[in-house]
Amino acid sequence: MSRRAVESLGETVASLPPREATLVTLPDLHPELSEALHKMGASRLYSHQLEAYERVRAGENVVVATATASGKSLCYKIPAFQNALGRTKSRSIFLYPTKALAQDQLGKIKGFGLPGIHPATYDGDTPQALRADIRRRSNVVLTNPDMLNIGLLPNHEAWGDFLRNLEIVAVDEAHVLRGVFGSHVAAVLRRLRRVAELHGGDPRFVLTSATIANPQELAESLTGLPFSLVDDDGASSGPRRVVFRNPPLLDKEKGERRSLLTEGALVFADLVSRGIRTIAFARSRKAAELIYRYAAERLGIEGARRISPYRAGYTARERRDIEGRLFSGDLLGVVSTNALELGVDVGALDAVVCCGYPGSVASIWQQWGRAGRGKDPSLAVYIAGRDSLDQFLFENPPRVLGRRVEAARVTMENPYILGPHLLAAAHEAPLDAEDERYFGPAYRDVAKKMMEDRMLAASGERLIYARSDSPARNVSLRSASFETVLIADTDGELIGTAEATRAPSELHPGATYLHRGNAYEIEDLDLRLHRAVARRVPNNFYTKPKVETDVEIVEEVETRGLPNGAALHWGRVRTTDSVTFYKKVRVADEKELGVYPLDLPDVTLETQALWVTLPPIPRGARPSFESFGGALHAGEHGMIGLLPLFAMCDRADIGGLSTPAHHQNRLPTIFVYDGYPGGVGISWRGFDAFSSLARDTVGVITRCPCERGCPACIQSPKCGNWNEPLSKTGAVDLLRYLLGQTSKYPAE
């Protein structure tokens, strides 16, 4: 890669040296497996692969946390294949977060050429006619959490022989199993343990993860079992140049910079035009399509033929075609969502461009790791977007380069998540008091609530499912809400779904809804029937709802003092959202086209929150709502903007409210709450790391070059109050007061 190509991109903030591999001889394996590894060029193993193998063979559950492209999959394949070649009845399940990754790994397993290994994918695309044969013949089944939930577990009797001989359960890419999705998967894995034991099975679990702060804790939280950690990476890596780039300022007063999408397209096109094989990662499907389109226009007809977008939503055939063309070198570049962040093999690449913060520092490293596999050199580029978290990382490269990665959290105490899985478990086999060992300390209370709701019924000392349907089919693994709204166009064709709790703000009559680059206007929303109807409209305006939020403190669980008599609290709250108006805004110039009233039912949410209380406003102080309320509001926005750096979540997963006098405590109060029923631990991370969160927020706001606040510091794209009022200087004064850096009350 030429020096000129790198220098054209911006400042190189780091040159990471290569790392030599630590190689060890193969252990005593079945001759066919040893021969297959030799033929594949793996005549020796990386040290971490051998350690994982030996620990699994010793009967331990193992989590492997090493870098991208370090051969983590061999850590579970070798023990699984060794078992199967030595005992014909031995069975394994390999669990992948996506069907695409399972298909990719199926090809790799077949590439071993082992006649005693009979792998098969088992997912929603598997024909019914093949499923019985898979249960009977396959000794390695590749599937995903969704299919485990609705396909295997409810039909465990048919899988009885397989489960009786189940010896290895591998969970690949475990770092993506966090928050709501991870908590659901934790319940699914515990249900798997339960039915396996019912049939006499006792599998070992092997989890692989990108580098995160708490791999062992995550593995134990997901499965409810003790784990050994393997994280001493023995794989080699080539030299890597790291470039951080900020789009140029267009308007200093407003803090407005060139679009992240435009900047990403410029960098991507420049690299591809130089023959550098590149992946650009975008944060959404729409962003990936737009970056590709802008880059194609810049490259011209011939250059555009060598690039492609890649995202979920394409057919399996389309994705395989793109992957194959990239692997073969026919394509020089791909613009992808995080669909390619996971381990689908696309061959040797030279450069990765992260277009904005992808949701975690761990994901940045995962994306960068897609280039320069083995000892090859690579280029890693991070382009900052306009929001506060992107700008914070641009200003603080050590937060990324120092690998200060986040902790991934799951919970088994959220009744909105655990409850549906207890119903599914009771349908699989009656529950009893012993099942607390699978489902944790919340089991008894949640089961009692399910009985009160007549979803479970007593049968002697056991609990049975009280209805005739299949409860597993009512579980959405990616939502903490029971209900979804179906969105159809005027011809009746389904174009999307949304959680019922978000429908009033996102699917109200008149709202714009985007689907595959097309704009729709919601004509009707029926919350009783959980249905919305949308019609195609020109893509030249968008809508913003006005949301009035109230927060009621239900239970204060933890509290601690802050400087100057302020206090920090954490506990359970009940939020009530009222969508009262919406406005139309023209895309071209952000001109407001009109404000329209709405009459919709309130949405309530019981969840977890942190809240900060200030002492009463000093006597004699007469702060205006714009100044003091704006300080509280801006401080709230600033902390919410950076909380994903601590909690490994998305900004949209968090809600907030600030008020100069809360109706329960009569004190100035800022709330930051989990945006999911029951909570998933996001606000707890903010409570636990509050001082660091507040300090980093001060740094973001003070370094931002805008005069009165912008999306890079205190404005929020999700604000239900349309970012009014906000005070940039007031937010800094407030946060410094809470940190004890000043004793001056922020209203004075």
Residue ranges and their predicted role:
Residues 209, 714-717:
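Cys/His-coordinated zinc-binding microdomains
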Residues 704, 709-713:
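Short cysteine clusters
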